[in-house]
């Protein structure tokens, strides 16, 4: 990737790439100080931003042209210079000469400085634009225009980047203010303010991505019906008063935060000058500033509301707070809206302060001596729920909804707090999906039957590679329900003892994948119990634990799911780790999880896994590396996976594997033997669960049963409404906890170090 080189002292000589040498400079427009950026409230620091060896120069009196002054003078740019611009995947970064025209509110670029008097190669309007920093490349900034265009730019150094960001944001802010003062009630463009940066901030520290907890989206939405526009405006006056009250409370909390940070000592492990704390101060202030401007725009729109007798023009627009005007006051006050009422609804995507939260369980905490018996075994029944339903392709109205969503998102945007349309939901919770990874419990329990550490680690790798295919239901990429804080899922499996054998012993008779191996006599089977719980909502952390007392085996795992928008796909990173403990052997196998990707989200979405995961046992010295290969752009196979098991003390590879994680896997051992496993023919052991009427109120299937019911009927509106009710109940409970300053206490898991462990694990009780 070509990158801009830093300038040398005096602006000449350049770096390794002289064509990319940045020569940005501010030019005088002949404006008075009152018309300069400093006069508009933007802090210009001539000393800090001065020319220091080829950098940018800025002064308060000569930064920008006065929009109103200058008479018949030739209009001059506020800033110009060389930046690297990302063009496309093949050409990468290219040096271009950029000119910022403050008076016109335009960012233009040319091939080089000599061609700047010709027609520009590209022009980006800065009115209502968002300027944010990016970690994709050094000294990178991204400019998002209000019409959806985007420029990815790189400066030569941090000072150069800072100058451009400051001036671009000042220009965007100025023109947004001017447009809101002139015709606030008759604008026809669509403006979206996203928490990737804010044009209202001139602080250097604030010019980075806002935290993921930042508030969401304020959109200007066109209403075709003038009557609907008048009704919407009349509804907002009282609602905005409540928003103002909430803003006042948040401002007070932000002041307390700043005071607490500034009260920290000047030395020690944590000081008031800590980089992360400075960023926290800046982003919180910038967020409030942005929200304040949005609220001012909304208030101006309400004041401009026409009387009932007035007939506005067809182009009149409504400033909407997070969504359609028909939503309740409580939703507006919370700053959140539920998912789409239907696939063709009038939508504005809202970013939630918390990811799909619902009411927490009011059941008492488990007693410390209650043991790991989570549910009554005699109440459990085999799960007969049909998982093989055929899903149709994306319908046209659904595709338009997804396309609208994509237009609201930015590359790399965190989707953890984005409300997704209900029709893309899978009919199960994420906690149940983790349980479905255990659909081959015979392979898991067979690990303990290995006679040597080598046999056991290879058996674990075999189980690991065959676990993921059953966790994915159907061919289409569907999103499971986001577990709410306090949600739990319980199930178990019964595995006939004659099915649990080491791979080195004589193989047992094959069973069809459509057969469900069951033990008629419970005494002739092993019992594997499973419990999962959502222990945190920010970040969203799920924990699950399973154990088999008879085999003295248990698995404890915590996973933080972090999703990211990647254009035509969505990536989900599963951050965390699991530990498999074999108590009879004193071995602990630590493992991580791959990332998941939903591809082709506009047509027929499909899922693939990607990334490198590690499995290691400190006691035996064995480790394994498993690589899930994503499909390349051109050619290549899908769902490919490779693995290698190694004995670290002797640096010996004892096993290699390759194939497809949802198809055929071939294992080659150190003794020359090979083994082929077809995951599609492996027997699937059904889960055993209690019926819904005997499940607790916070157990996944009971909690989501109404949503699941309406999704099965195809009633998206009703499913969306049920989901919204769950979310609203949870927000009420969360506000109660905040008021009482009562921290959330998970029911079955406790924090330990950087992770979470089951409160009464097998290794502590046996």
Curated annotation (Swiss-Prot):
Assigned keywords, A-Z: Coiled coil, Cytoplasm, Cytoskeleton, Lipid biosynthesis, Lipid metabolism, Lipid transport, Lipid-binding, Methylation, Phosphoprotein, Transport
Record-listed Omega-N-methylarginine modification sites: 40
Annotated residues for binding of a 1,2-diacyl-sn-glycero-3-phospho-L-serine: 415-420, 482, 563
Example GO BP: lipid transport
A Gene Ontology term for the protein's cellular component: cytoplasm
Record SUPFAM superfamilies: Oxysterol-binding protein-like, PH domain-like
Modified residues (Phosphoserine): 31-32, 59, 62, 66, 203, 211, 225
Main location: cytoplasm
Region annotation Disordered: where it falls in the sequence: 1-76, 306-337, 356-395
Entry's localization field: Cytoplasm, Cytoskeleton
Composition-biased stretches (Polar residues): 325-337
InterPro entries in the cross-refs: OSBP_sf (IPR037239), Oxysterol-bd (IPR000648), Oxysterol-bd_CS (IPR018494), PH-like_dom_sf (IPR011993), PH_domain (IPR001849)
Binding sites annotated in the UniProt record for a 1,2-diacyl-sn-glycero-3-phospho-(1D-myo-inositol 4-phosphate): 415-420, 479-482, 537-538, 723, 727, 731
Bias type Low complexity, positions: 17-48, 57-67
Biased composition (Acidic residues): 366-383
Residues annotated with Phosphothreonine modification: 198
Location of the PH domain: 76-173
A molecular-function term among this protein's GO annotations: cholesterol binding
Function: Probable lipid transporter involved in lipid countertransport between the endoplasmic reticulum and the plasma membrane. Its ability to bind phosphatidylserine, suggests that it specifically exchanges phosphatidylserine with phosphatidylinositol 4-phosphate (PI4P), delivering phosphatidylserine to the plasma membrane in exchange for PI4P. Plays a role in negative regulation of lipid biosynthesis. Negatively regulates APOB secretion from hepatocytes. Binds cholesterol and acidic phospholipids. Also binds 25-hydroxycholesterol. Binds phosphatidylserine.
Subunit structure: Interacts with OSBPL9. Interacts with DIAPH1.
Comment text on domains: The C-terminal region binds cholesterol, 25-hydroxysterol and acidic phospholipids and is required for localization to microtubules. The PH domain selectively interacts with phosphatidylinositol-4-phosphate.
The name this protein goes by in its record: Oxysterol-binding protein-related protein 10
Taxonomic source organism: Mus musculus (Mouse)
Name of encoding gene: Osbpl10
């Amino acid at each position: 990737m070509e990158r801009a080189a830093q300038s040398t002292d005096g602006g000449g000589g350049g770096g390794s790439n002289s064509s990319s040498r940045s020569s940005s400079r501010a030019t005088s427009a002949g404006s008075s100080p009152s018309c300069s950026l400093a006069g508009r409230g933007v802090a210009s620091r001539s000393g800090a931003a001065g020319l220091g060896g080829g950098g940018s120069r800025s002064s308060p009196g000569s930064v920008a042209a006065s929009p109103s002054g200058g008479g018949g003078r030739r209009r001059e740019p506020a800033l110009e210079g060389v930046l690297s611009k990302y063009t496309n995947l093949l050409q990468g970064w290219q040096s271009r000469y950029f000119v910022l025209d403050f008076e016109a509110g335009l960012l233009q670029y040319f091939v080089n400085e000599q061609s700047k008097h010709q027609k520009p190669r590209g022009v980006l309007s800065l009115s209502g634009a968002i300027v944010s920093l990016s970690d994709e490349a050094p000294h990178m900034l991204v400019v998002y225009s209000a019409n959806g265009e985007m420029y990815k730019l790189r400066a030569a150094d941090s000072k150069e980047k800072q100058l451009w960001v400051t001036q671009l944001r000042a220009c965007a802010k100025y023109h947004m203010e001017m447009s809101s003062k002139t015709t606030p009630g008759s604008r026809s463009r669509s403006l979206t303010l996203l928490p990737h940066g804010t044009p209202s901030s001139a602080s250097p520290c604030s010019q980075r991505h806002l935290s993921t907890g930042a508030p969401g989206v304020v959109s200007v939405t066109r209403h075709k019906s003038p009557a609907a526009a008048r009704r919407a405006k009349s509804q907002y006056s009282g609602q905005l008063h409540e928003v103002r009250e909430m803003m006042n409370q948040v401002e007070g909390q932000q002041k307390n935060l700043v005071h607490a940070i500034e009260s920290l000592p000047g030395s020690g492990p944590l000081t008031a000058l800590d980089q992360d704390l400075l960023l926290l101060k800046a982003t919180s202030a910038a967020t409030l500033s942005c929200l304040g401007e949005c609220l001012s725009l909304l208030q101006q729109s309400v004041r401009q509301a026409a009387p009932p007798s007035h007939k506005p023009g067809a182009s009149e627009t409504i400033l909407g707070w997070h969504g359609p005007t028909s939503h309740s006051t409580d939703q507006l006050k919370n700053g959140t809206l539920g998912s789409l009422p239907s696939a063709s609804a009038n939508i504005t995507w809202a970013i939630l302060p918390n990811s799909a939260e619902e009411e927490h369980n009011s059941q008492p905490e488990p007693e410390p001596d209650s043991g790991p018996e989570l549910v009554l075994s005699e109440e459990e029944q085999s799960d007969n729920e049909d998982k093989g339903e055929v899903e149709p392709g994306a319908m046209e109205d659904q595709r338009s909804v997804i396309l609208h969503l994509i237009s609201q998102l930015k590359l790399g945007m965190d989707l953890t707090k984005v409300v997704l349309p209900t029709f893309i939901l899978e009919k199960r919770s994420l906690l149940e999906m983790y349980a479905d990874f255990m659909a081959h419990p015979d392979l898991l329990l067979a690990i303990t039957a290995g006679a040597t550490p080598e046999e056991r680690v290879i058996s674990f790798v075999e189980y690991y590679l065959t676990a993921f295919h059953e966790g994915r239901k159907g061919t289409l990429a569907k999103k499971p329900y986001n577990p709410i804080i306090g949600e739990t899922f319980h199930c178990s499996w019964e595995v006939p003892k004659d099915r649990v054998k080491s791979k080195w012993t004589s193989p047992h008779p094959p069973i069809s994948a459509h057969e469900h191996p069951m033990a008629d006599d419970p005494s002739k089977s092993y019992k594997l119990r499973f419990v999962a719980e959502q222990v945190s909502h920010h970040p969203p952390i799920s924990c699950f634990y399973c154990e088999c007392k008879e085999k003295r085996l248990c698995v404890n795992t915590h996973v933080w799911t972090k999703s990211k928008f990647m254009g035509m796909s969505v990536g989900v990173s599963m951050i965390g780790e699991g530990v498999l403990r074999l108590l009879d052997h004193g071995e602990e196998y630590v493992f991580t999880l791959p990332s998941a990707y939903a591809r082709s989200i506009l047509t027929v979405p499909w899922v693939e896994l990607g990334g490198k995961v590690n499995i290691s046992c400190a006691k035996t010295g064995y480790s394994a590396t498993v690589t899930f290969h994503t499909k390349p752009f051109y050619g290549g196979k899908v769902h490919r996976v490779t693995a290698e098991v190694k004995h670290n003390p002797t640096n010996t590879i004892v096993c290699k594997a390759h194939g497809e994680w949802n198809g055929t896997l071939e294992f080659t051992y150190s003794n020359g033997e090979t083994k082929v496993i077809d995951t599609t023919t492996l027997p699937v052991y059904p889960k055993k669960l209690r019926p819904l009427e005997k499940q607790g109120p916070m157990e996944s299937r009971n909690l989501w049963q109404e949503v699941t019911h309406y999704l099965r009927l195809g009633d998206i509106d009703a499913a969306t409404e049920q989901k919204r009710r769950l979310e609203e109940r949870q927000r009420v409970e969360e506000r109660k906890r905040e008021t009482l300053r009562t921290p959330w206490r998970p029911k079955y898991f406790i924090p330990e170090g950087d992770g979470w462990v089951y409160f009464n694990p097998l290794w502590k009780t046996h």
